[in-house]
Amino acid sequence: MIIVLLGAPGAGKGTQSVLVAEKYGLKHISTGDLLREEIANNTELGKQAKKLIDGGNLVPDEMILGLLKNAFLNRGKGVVLDGFPRTLSQAEMMHPIVKGLAEKLSAVINIKLSEDEITQRIVLRRQCKNCGNIFNLRFIKNFDGKCPKCGSTDIYQRADDNEESAKNRINVYHSQTEPVVGFYKNKTYYKEVDGSKNKEEVFEEISKFINRKK
């Protein structure tokens, strides 16, 4: 089974990807995590990627697709792709790779959210340094300064989680990622869900659709 989760920044792709992976026993794949792993392991690909990133350049699609191919080799029951493909060219390049696998593309789920909600979520997003948990103050009543997952007080806000950055990322989403939605929109395995609901409700809607497409 191969599941793709799309959506604007702050829509909850990461959260829902983890939940889907846990429920269906799938491998959670984030291209950002794959890149960071290659860089941390000082692989040849990691060295090339680091040089590009340090120079303020984007990592080319070919390099990302190479990472994805390697990740697919150890996919087990299947994968959840977290926020990938991000561009139309990535979607087009990924298509023949998926066609060559035994599993089919089971579901492409687009988490919809208004621009105001996206901005608020990005600004209120926090991460735990201890366990890596990402959470949102918007959904926590009477936040006590502790990570909801591990209880650590070592909480921080990522440097790019601010209003100006949110606007820039929304613009990039409209110009680069919305065409990906058009690529999949008329497929029977495409589904839009309302991301303004709480994560449990969103997950329930996603799960119902996946169950129908398994």
Swiss-Prot record:
Residues 124-161 are annotated as: LID. Its EC number is 2.7.4.3. Pathway: Purine metabolism; AMP biosynthesis via salvage pathway; AMP from ADP: step 1/1. GO terms for cellular component: cytoplasm. One of its GO terms (biological process) is AMP salvage. Keywords: ATP-binding, Cytoplasm, Kinase, Metal-binding, Nucleotide biosynthesis, Nucleotide-binding, Transferase, Zinc. Zn(2+) binds at residues 128, 131, 147, 150. It is found in: Cytoplasm. It catalyses: AMP + ATP = 2 ADP. The keyword Protein biosynthesis does not apply. AMP binds at residues 31, 36, 57-59, 83-86, 90, 158, 169. Residues 30-59 are annotated as: NMP. PROSITE patterns: ADENYLATE_KINASE. Its main location: cytoplasm. GO terms for molecular function: adenylate kinase activity; ATP binding; zinc ion binding. The keyword Metal-binding applies. Monomer. NCBIfam families: adk (TIGR01351), PRK00279.1-3 (NF001381), PRK14527.1 (NF011100). Consists of three domains, a large central CORE domain and two small peripheral domains, NMPbind and LID, which undergo movements during catalysis. The LID domain closes over the site of phosphoryl transfer upon ATP binding. Assembling and dissambling the active center during each catalytic cycle provides an effective means to prevent ATP hydrolysis. Some bacteria have evolved a zinc-coordinating structure that stabilizes the LID domain. Catalyzes the reversible transfer of the terminal phosphate group between ATP and AMP. Plays an important role in cellular energy homeostasis and in adenine nucleotide metabolism. Belongs to the adenylate kinase family. This is Adenylate kinase. The gene is adk.
